[in-house]
Every structure is written in C-alpha cells, then in structure tokens.
Amino acid sequence: MKKFTFPITTIFLSVLILVSCKETKNNSVQPSDKTSVLKAGYQIEPVNIQNVKLNDSFWLPIIKRVQEVTIAYAIQKCNEEGRFENFLIAGKQKTGTVRGEMPFDDTDVYKIIEGASNTLISAPNPKLERVLDSLIAIVKIGQEADGYLTTWRTINPAKPPATWVPVIEGKRWESLQISHECYNAGHLIEAAVVHYEATGKRNFLDIAIKNADLFVKTFGDGPGQVKGVPGHQIIETGLIKLYQITGKEDYLKLAKYFLDNRGNPNNHKLYGEYAQDHIPVIQQNEVVGHAVRAVYMYAGMTDIAAMTKDKSYENAVNNLWNNMVNKKMYITGGIGSRHDGEAFGTNYELPNLTAYNETCAAIGDVYWNHRLHSLYGKSQYFDVIERTMYNGLISGISLTGKEFFYPNALEADGVYKSNRGSCTRQAWFDCSCCPTNLIRFIPSIPGLIYSKTNDVLYVNLYASSNSAFKLGKTDLQISQQTSYPWNGKVGISVNPKKEGQFTIKLRVPGWARNEVLPGDLYTYKKASTQRATITINGEAVAVQQQDGYFTINRNWKKGDKIALNFPMEVQEVQTNSKVETNKNKVSLEYGPIVYAVEEIDNKTNFDKINVASGDSFKVKKEVNLLNGVNVIENEKFKAIPYYSWSNRGVGKMKVWLDYKN
C-alpha cells in the first residue's frame, strides 16, 4: 500500500496559511436566515451567528485573536504532539505507536475544526476552509470501515496512551467508564454539524454519521447489543444535534437511552458520583462529581426535556440548576471547586486559593444555560452566561491568545501551582482540552446575542453589532451601538422592512437589578439606588420588567431608536455566611466585570489590602493597560478585571478582600 504523505505536509502549510488568514472584511449581514441547530423542540431559537456581525471593541478583538492566532497555534501544537499523526497511523498510512498521553486526544482536532468552522459562518475565508478540508481528510483516514473512530484503540488496543485506561481483552467498549470512545464520538459529531452548517459540505458530516450509525447499531437492550453508558458525557448532545439536522429519530432515541440508563445498576456496573452515575438522572437534585461531565449531561437532559416534553427531565434540570447557582457557583461564574476529581464540592464549599473552576466547565455551563433560556425565556440564565463569559471563562485565555489557564483560581500566592504545575498561565498542557475548547466556543459568541420566536425578539447580550434575520414573516435589521461592558449605555436601531407589530424583550442584567446571581449566594453590600431606564425615539417609556426583560410590544417602523441606560457603579459583593472562606470579605464589581487586585499593581501593600466601610472608589479607563481596561482604584489599591490577571508574570492575586467596619 502506498503511504499517505500529503496531509502531514499540508499541516505545516496550514499553519503558514492560517497565520496569514485575516478575517474577511465583511460588516454586511448575509441575506440568508439560517436557523440554529438548537431550534428543533424548543419554543425559542437563537439567532444564528451567520446573521450577526460584531463590530464591538470587546468581543470582536478576542474572536479575531482566536481566528488569527490561537487556531494556528493549536494546529502547530497538535502537529508537534502527534494528534494528526495518530489518524494516519490508525489508517495504516504511517507506521508507529500512538502519540500523546490522553485517550481523548482526537477531540482536540475536532474542536479546532468546530471553532474554525464557526469563524467561517461569521466571515467566509476560502484559505481557512481549505485548511479544514485537509484536517478532515486526515480524520477520515483514521476511521475504520464500519465507522469506528478512536485512534488509540485502532492503533493498538492493548496499549492505551494513558496507564489509567484498563485493558481487559482489548475489545471495543469494554471500559466505557474511562476509554472515552463515546466522548470522542460526541465531539466528532458536534464539530461535524457546525462544519456542515458553516460550509454546506458533507465531507465531515458523513464521517460523523457513519460513526453515529455504528453507535446506534451497537448500543441498546436488543439481542447482541452492548449495554452501558458513556463515562464522559457529550455524545448525548452530539446525537441530538445530528437528529435535529437529519430528522433520524434513532439518534434521539440513543441519546435518551444513554441518559435513561445512567444510574441503572441493571444496565451496567455503576461509575458513581464522579460520573453522575450514582442514581438515575431524573432523581438527581444536587450537582456532584466531575463538573465538565456534569454540565454536558445537564445540557443533554435539557434537550431531552425540550424534545420529548418529559416533565421528569425538566424537574431534574431545574433542581440541579437551582442547587448549582444557589450553593456551588463562584462569583466569576466558575464551577467545580475541587482539584480532586475536577469536581463540585459540597454545598457552599468555595475555596479561593485552591479553586479549580475548569475552563471547560465554564464553557459547558454556558451551553447548558443557553438551552435553558431556549426552554423558558427567562433572563436568569443569561445572567449566569454573562457573568461566566466576562469573568471565569475568558480568564482561561491570555491576551496574546497563546497561554492558558486550565483551572481558574480566585487567589494566588505566587507559590501554589494551581495551573497544572504552574503558578501562571501555560503555553499548552498534556491534557489540552481547555485551549481547544476555547477555540471551539469563542467564535460562537455572536450566536448568543439574540433569540426569537415568531413574533418576539429577545435581546440577551449587549455588543455593538449589525444583524439581519426574519422574525416570523418580518424581515428585520437591528443594530447595537455600545461600549459595554465598560459603559452601560446601549443604543439600538430597529429597522423592519415593513412596519409591523411585534415584541422586543430587552434584558436588564442582574447586576442592574441589584442581583448578583439568582438566589442568595451573593448579595450587594449596599443596593444601588440607580435604576435602568429606557427611551424609544427619545421619549421615556414606563415599562415593567417581565422575567428580567423590558418587554415592548408595539408597531415598529424603520428608524425606531431604543436607548437603554444601565447605570454602573462600583459595588461591594458579600457572600452567604455559609461560605466560610469569604467571611468578613468583599469583592468588587463594575457592571458585569468582577475585579481582582494583582501584586504587580500593589507591590508595597498587597498583603494588607482591605476595603473599609465608607471607602470610595473611582473608575478610570487605562487604554494602554491589558489591551485597554477600566480599573478601580482609591488611595489604598488598584484593581483590574479578573479575566486579565496573570498576563504580566507570576505574582499574587486575590478577588476577595478583607472588609473592615
């Protein structure tokens, strides 16, 4: 057999091409109105990122950095560490042993393709599309004839890349708890669906369908089928997305089978709390175990609640969400407090120095809350999303796009190595799930801004942008002008093609309603007396908030202008007294941004920094600091946005400050 050498050469060329791939300059909105894949089964659907063009000064530079720097960097790292080579060895186009240290290394390739595909939706780029075609060609080589695709097992089932993966007889599916065969398939499917939406090409989708069809044939209670559930969840949401674009109910049924049989000892030997496999999912009411697995599972459960109208699933996800937000979420939106097991702790167990808060968990939580919003339309889910995105999620990536946090601690002493062996950001990890998950997620952010029904538009997030889509039968163009999150003033231009009546719901952020997060885990020490206001065409409007939204139903016409003002002031946040680590401490916020003090700005007095009753603060824009940020300062200290810490070397940091009456 002739050895396949072209793709590896292509990888090196791909990196060079990508470095030169600047975003296609395109501020106009595509005329098509592509429906989001999340739509089917939900009453509310997100407006697809193809219909939303950002021009803001906060998110757009971050997305561009991922497009122009991080994707190329990750391809280079994956090439160096043998991610691509594994597919070629599995397909017998190269000889060798498995490269890498994790049984899920294949997923780094899939997540890069997914994130890059999302950039193609926002801004078509033929060069980047050719790079993806090369990567997909390599993936295809590693797929077995019947659709199976986990390269380490194909290369040598007797020698997994990690010693903690058990080998019994070397058969497929024999160690589902830890083999990550299902997890690999889940990321493959999710990435393939996004790539298909972005390009209309089936080259990646056909690989995923072939793989999914093998799962449908293999798993179940029928004669000769394998019983069991994934060790690491995500295949459930992948299968449901595949069902949504193909209409093939077998995928939905298998996703539900996996969820229905979690916690079922008659189906398999249970994996325990770590994998949320201790009791049936519909009986679970406390978030436990590995945080990333958990939120991926809860997202799948929410899909099932929406698709099947199963009230037992709906009740379970509501109970789980309430437990997480009320008792186990950090002020930054981070979740999963324990390094041991990368897991949720007990209720109110929220340490700062040793906080884990895996970046992947923050990303998974956004995916889950987005689904909950599509199910219920309540702003509380976007309060969680906004807090997470601006704080404990983008803290995971540096301002250069080439260094990362895997955990996201809320305190650093300059000694404790919280970041997988380092006190500061790292250039890569042996387990590189977080960097590639950031690539996967960040380009999808424009798809979070709006949601809609036939006659209701939800404005969920605020960012300068131009958008065009159909609202029912109405062709609608809408634009935002704002300096959010540094300023709370937002201008919105509404331009329907024809005058008509419909409803616009404008989210009033929780912080602008004196609510840190839903529930009583955090409160502002002193409630703001300032109130959010709204005008339409220059006239003040008295409108009651409904589920956290200003709701305006009227006859809208071209040129209508909405002006929102969410007054910002420095707020001191206190924690529920049941959180022992934060007693007699406060954190500082300005708008949606959580602040931290860093030693580099406070060298002479860092260990003595405190907030006293009656302290005043000023907010100042520093355009040359950390890519341009608002800082909070007074005569005692200077604070920077938490997400931007550790971009200037190793040092101390803290979010929670001693409070003195």
Predicted features by range, described:
Residues 22-28:
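Bacterial lipoprotein signal-peptidase II cleavage site
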